[in-house]
Amino acid sequence: MNREEVTDLIVTQKVKKKLTWAQLAEVVGHSKEWSTAALLGQMTLTEAQAKAIGTTLDLPEEAVTQLQVVPYKGSLPTAVPTDPLIYRFYELISVYGTTFKSLIHEEFGDGIMSAIDFNMDLTREADPKGDRVRITMSGKFLPYKTY
């Protein structure tokens, strides 16, 4: 059983058991954002976390073991995404990526925002014109070194 098959099984069991990502995050013991990334194959669970998820979702031992293996991160297809929601993020980076880069460099200097030392929070924001999605990302600034 590979990581993609484990992810498919997790999603199937989540739907079958009528669980939310937030409920599964409580089992994992981390934020819903990090836990969802882990359960979708992008992070590594500890043995205790993997066993707890395995019990909650009735996963086979092989899947529980696979959840403890460091995944190949960023393993989404490299083509332009076709899923409408994921494409909007692609579009957002295409339009605002140079703005993010310019403003971060102006504020912090030459470097990058870490996706390793990173936090994310996703919430619903009530709006009379239609609810909005609020995503807050916080990554440590890592300056490039000269040598």
Swiss-Prot record:
It is an enzyme of class 4 (lyase). Its EC number is 4.2.1.104. InterPro entries: Cyanase, Cyanate_lyase_C, Cyanate_lyase_C_sf, CYNS_N, Lambda_DNA-bd_dom_sf. SUPFAM superfamilies: Cyanase C-terminal domain, lambda repressor-like DNA-binding domains. It holds the Pfam family CYNS_N. Keywords: Lyase. It catalyses: cyanate + hydrogencarbonate + 3 H(+) = NH4(+) + 2 CO2. The active site is at 88, 91, 114. Transmembrane segments: none annotated. GO terms for biological process: cyanate metabolic process. GO terms for molecular function: cyanate hydratase activity; DNA binding. Belongs to the cyanase family. Catalyzes the reaction of cyanate with bicarbonate to produce ammonia and carbon dioxide. This is Cyanate hydratase. The gene is cynS.
